[in-house]
């Protein structure tokens, strides 16, 4: 089980690398889906089922809408692939920064191990269900702030993707 959890963590990092070094929006969607599926499966394997489901619905429901809209506006007949030398260079740079951070920061994190949600002791309420109560009691203000931030991010992305054209309001 430990190897499976560490494999999911590796898939999560590789998905994030694919999103960060995408040459075109087509491949960014693939990296986002890989990272969200791996991250939610990682949480699911650790026993946090509700938070995993909520994050999966938010990632695939919200972020893919933005990617689909940007793909439709940035239609490129010949998109660059991940095999291009610039993209491979970016990927190697990210891996070099990761290795350098591990060398400079030390390898203390290797001794931590993988701990599931109920493995520490006797709990009366699972940690993810306690988090659900926090979502609906104290988290209302944070949800409003997060929703406003996501709406602002949507408009910023739409404005950046639109460029100099008028988008859907162009003259017929």
Swiss-Prot record:
UniProt KW Plastid keyword: no
InterPro entries given in the database record: ComplexI_Subunit6 (IPR050269), NADH_UbQ/plastoQ_OxRdtase_su6 (IPR001457), Nuo/plastoQ_OxRdtase_6_NuoJ (IPR042106)
Localization in the cell: Mitochondrion membrane
GO MF term list: NADH dehydrogenase (ubiquinone) activity
Role noted for this protein: Core subunit of the mitochondrial membrane respiratory chain NADH dehydrogenase (Complex I) that is believed to belong to the minimal assembly required for catalysis. Complex I functions in the transfer of electrons from NADH to the respiratory chain. The immediate electron acceptor for the enzyme is believed to be ubiquinone.
Top-level taxon of the source organism: Eukaryota
Catalytic activity, reaction form: a ubiquinone + NADH + 5 H(+)(in) = a ubiquinol + NAD(+) + 4 H(+)(out)
Alphabetical keyword list: Electron transport, Membrane, Mitochondrion, NAD, Respiratory chain, Translocase, Transmembrane, Transmembrane helix, Transport, Ubiquinone
Keyword Chaperone: no
Record gene name: MT-ND6
Membrane topology per record: Multi-pass membrane protein
Lineage of the species this protein comes from: Eukaryota, Metazoa, Chordata, Craniata, Vertebrata
This protein's name: NADH-ubiquinone oxidoreductase chain 6
PANTHER family to which the protein is assigned, alphabetical: NADH UBIQUINONE OXIDOREDUCTASE SUBUNIT ND6, NADH-UBIQUINONE OXIDOREDUCTASE CHAIN 6
Record-linked Pfam families: Oxidored_q3
Family: Belongs to the complex I subunit 6 family.
A GO CC term assigned to this protein in UniProt: mitochondrial membrane
Major localization class: mitochondrion
């Amino acid at each position: 089980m430990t190897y499976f959890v560490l494999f999911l963590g590796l898939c999560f990092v590789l998905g994030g690398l694919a999103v960060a070094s995408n040459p075109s929006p087509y491949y960014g969607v693939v990296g986002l889906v890989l990272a969200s599926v791996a991250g939610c499966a990682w949480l699911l394997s650790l026993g946090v089922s509700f938070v995993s489901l909520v994050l999966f619905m938010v990632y695939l429901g919200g972020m893919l809408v933005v990617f689909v809209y940007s793909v439709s506006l940035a239609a490129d007949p010949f998109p660059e692939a991940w095999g291009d030398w610039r993209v491979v260079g970016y990927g190697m740079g990210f891996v070099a920064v990761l290795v350098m951070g591990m060398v400079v920061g030390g390898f203390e994190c290797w001794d931590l191990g993988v701990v599931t949600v109920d493995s520490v002791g006797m709990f009366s309420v699972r940690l993810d269900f306690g988090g659900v109560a926090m979502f609906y009691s104290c988290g209302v203000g944070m949800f409003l702030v997060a929703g406003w931030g996501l709406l602002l991010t949507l408009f910023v992305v739409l404005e950046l993707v639109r460029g100099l054209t008028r988008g859907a309001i162009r003259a017929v």
